[in-house]
């Protein structure tokens, strides 16, 4: 038996030892399941998340980089633990931790948008993306930052769904494939140039807007919406700089964005701008 056939058989065996509890997403290029590992004696462990990606789409590579880093001893505060990556036929599969909590979208819906909510959660969101940018060389660019791709448990924030994340290529001029959620994705993600750390800065600016207004971002109406929601002017400026069309005009790193956000909160609290707080942050988790 040659090595390639043995690898295929091993992958099939690994794939078949899970029981599918629920299909969470089933798209053309990706399928996401909640699964339980079934032992030889019938006992179960889990739940876990299993994702399948079309091999030809070139998706899911970030998971393997994270798995390799974790196997070498790296520990991440804001990323799910990856347990396995393997190929089955024309698909790549990844099995990972099922992160507890609620999505950021659900938290905003339940608590209502406010500066106070942004103050509590946005720093953790930035820290999560910083792990992708700063703990990997070359950095991982998430490319699909949006409220449904962050999980919140208490005040802890985890970034999930790294399917279209890519490794930055200093020699490339554009992304080979164009994916992402249009309301949050920067112009360069759809053919204007290569995505880099500043592309995630743009998406984080859109996500900050959502935390403040709970509206789907429309780039031409952001300034007006921020004013309508009584967002302090210094914080509006942070959002507007983050979502600049030209990457050179944005904050040049997520850390720079996070520092500007912290400073704007401090200034707003000391100024005559009123911080309008929503309901106390409570997502029902002790």
Region spans (language model):
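Protein kinase catalytic-loop region centered on the HRD/HxD motif
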Residues: 127-140
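Short beta-strand micro-motifs within the conserved protein kinase catalytic domain, predominantly
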Residues: 81-91
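ATP-binding glycine-rich loop module of kinase domains
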Residues: 28-64
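Conserved catalytic-loop aspartate of Hanks-type protein kinases
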Residues: 200
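Conserved short submotifs of the Hanks-type protein kinase catalytic core
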Residues: 89-103
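Conserved activation segment of eukaryotic-like protein kinases, specifically the C-terminal portion
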Residues: 174-188
């Amino acid at each position: 038996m040659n090595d390639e056939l043995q690898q295929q058989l091993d992958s099939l065996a690994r794939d078949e030892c899970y029981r599918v509890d629920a299909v969470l997403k089933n798209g053309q290029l990706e399928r996401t399941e909640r699964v339980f590992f079934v032992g030889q004696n019938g006992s179960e462990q889990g739940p876990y998340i299993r994702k399948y990606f079309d091999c030809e789409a070139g998706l899911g590579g970030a998971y393997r980089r994270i798995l390799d880093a974790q196997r070498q001893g790296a520990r991440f505060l804001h990323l799910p633990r990856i347990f396995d990556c393997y190929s089955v036929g024309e698909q790549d599969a990844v099995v990972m931790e099922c992160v507890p909590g609620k999505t950021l979208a659900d938290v905003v819906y339940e608590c209502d948008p406010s500066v106070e909510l942004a103050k509590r959660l946005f720093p953790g969101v930035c820290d999560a993306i910083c792990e992708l940018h700063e703990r990997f060389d070359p950095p991982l660019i998430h490319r699909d930052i949006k409220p449904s791709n962050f999980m919140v448990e208490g005040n802890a924030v985890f970034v999930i769904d790294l399917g279209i994340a890519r490794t930055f290529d200093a020699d490339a001029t554009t992304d080979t494939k164009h994916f992402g959620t249009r309301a949050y994705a920067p112009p360069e993600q759809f053919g204007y140039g290569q995505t880099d750390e500043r592309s995630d800065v743009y998406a984080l600016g859109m996500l900050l807007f959502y935390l403040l207004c709970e509206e789907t971002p429309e780039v031409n109406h952001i300034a007006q919406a921020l004013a309508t929601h009584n967002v302090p002017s210094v914080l509006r400026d942070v959002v507007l700089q983050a979502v600049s069309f030209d990457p050179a005009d944005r904050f040049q790193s997520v850390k720079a964005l996070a520092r500007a956000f912290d400073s704007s909160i401090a200034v707003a609290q000391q100024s005559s701008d009123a911080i309008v707080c929503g309901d106390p942050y409570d997502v029902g988790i002790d």
